[in-house]
């Protein structure tokens, strides 16, 4: 995607492999900064502190992080240690584990002195696959938007959190259909949930849509149900950090409430995700997906730009009050209209996914 007319990806290696560059998403939307990662530890910290975030992107970042670490210690013990360190950064998104397992499986049989360059090459392939998958998700999802637009009016899409190009290498998942539809001339407007506590919708999704010229409106998290009751939303499209083999969707906290409101009001509710987000080993998302509990300070404090152009962090919660901060929730498959994948739109059922991924039937 483009920033001020210049194409960017969220992550890209420096020539020669001395560093991997990422967009520092903690600085958006008020500052656009590139950060260099030179070690596995720096990659892990970037994932942990959400300099990079979004399930597909943290998977790619972990892959490059493993490659960076193997430059210093390519031994068997080093491979296992670095992979374990990166895997522990964020427990919910399955793409992280998927990318590390893919690399580790390729690298273990190799002589140690060949592992680092092979890891960089494979991380690059994962990144390119992500771009292709997200573009395909965009094409499939755009057809859903176009079908709604055929009724003769603007299509209003509600999205939650940020599942755009900032959450992937490029294009995004939930926002990819919107970009493809918009670029094709389909009249589309997006309601952007602010997405507390980190305000990733207001800060990141709005930033993306504004840069791309997509009409949008930022709304408070609690406004979605009201909008649906009054016919203001035609469909919901969200991303996913982990989707079970039976179609349960784990996504940013608050997604479940939007799905309930959509179900009650007859609004189609879709999740957009690449195959790397599907956890084929799980059938019950509520019982089986570990939910990351983040620092309560994300709830009690807000950081933003002041009127004089500076930045400040303020406390917004009564001092001394206990805080809970689960980062994700699980939307049961029964509330999900469909799963938009790189191979097409699947029913949110085990059979629906297996029809798109028949090669998983033997493994399922």
UniProtKB/Swiss-Prot annotation:
Pathway: Amino-acid biosynthesis; L-methionine biosynthesis via salvage pathway; L-methionine from S-methyl-5-thio-alpha-D-ribose 1-phosphate: step 1/6. The record marks 161 as: Transition state stabilizer. Keywords: Amino-acid biosynthesis, Isomerase, Methionine biosynthesis. One of its GO terms (biological process) is L-methionine salvage from methylthioadenosine. Pfam families: IF-2B. Its EC number is 5.3.1.23. Substrate binds at residues 53-55, 90, 200, 251-252. Catalyzes the interconversion of methylthioribose-1-phosphate (MTR-1-P) into methylthioribulose-1-phosphate (MTRu-1-P). HAMAP family: Salvage_MtnA (MF_01678). This is Methylthioribose-1-phosphate isomerase. It comes from Methylobacterium nodulans (strain LMG 21967 / CNCM I-2342 / ORS 2060).
């Amino acid at each position: 995607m483009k920033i001020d007319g210049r194409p960017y990806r969220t992550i890209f290696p420096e020539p020669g492999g001395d560093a991997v560059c990422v967009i520092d998403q903690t600085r958006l939307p008020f500052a656009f900064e590139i950060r260099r990662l030179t070690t596995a530890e720096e990659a892990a910290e970037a994932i942990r502190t959400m300099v990079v975030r979004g399930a597909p992107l943290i998977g790619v970042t972990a892959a490059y992080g493993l490659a960076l670490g193997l430059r210093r210690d390519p031994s068997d013990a080093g491979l296992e240690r670095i992979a374990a360190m990166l895997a522990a950064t964020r427990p919910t998104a399955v793409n992280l584990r998927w990318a590390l397992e893919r690399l580790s499986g390729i690298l273990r049989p190799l002589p140690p002195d060949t592992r680092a360059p092979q890891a960089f090459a494979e991380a690059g392939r994962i990144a390119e696959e992500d771009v292709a998958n997200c573009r395909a998700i965009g094409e499939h999802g755009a057809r859903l938007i176009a079908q709604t637009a055929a009724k003769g009016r603007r299509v209003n899409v509600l999205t939650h959190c940020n599942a755009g190009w900032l959450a992937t290498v490029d294009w995004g998942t939930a926002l990819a259909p919107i970009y493809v539809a918009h670029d094709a001339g389909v009249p589309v407007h997006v309601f952007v949930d602010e997405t507390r506590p980190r305000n990733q919708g207001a800060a990141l999704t709005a930033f993306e849509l504004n840069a791309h010229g997509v009409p949008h409106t930022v709304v408070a998290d609690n406004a979605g149900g009201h909008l649906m009751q009054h016919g203001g939303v035609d469909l919901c499209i969200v991303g996913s950090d982990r989707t079970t083999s039976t179609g349960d969707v784990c996504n940013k906290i608050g997604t479940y409430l939007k799905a309930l409101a959509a179900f009650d009001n007859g609004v189609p509710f879709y999740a957009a995700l690449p195959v790397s987000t599907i956890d084929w080993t799980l059938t019950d998302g509520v019982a089986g997906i570990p939910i990351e509990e983040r620092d309560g300070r994300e709830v009690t404090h807000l950081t933003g730009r002041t009127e004089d152009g500076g930045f400040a962090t303020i406390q917004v919660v009564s001092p001394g009050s206990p805080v809970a901060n689960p980062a994700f929730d699980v939307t049961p498959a029964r509330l999900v209209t469909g799963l938009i994948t790189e191979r097409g739109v699947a029913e949110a059922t085990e059979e629906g996914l297996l029809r798109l991924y028949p090669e998983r039937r033997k493994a399922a």
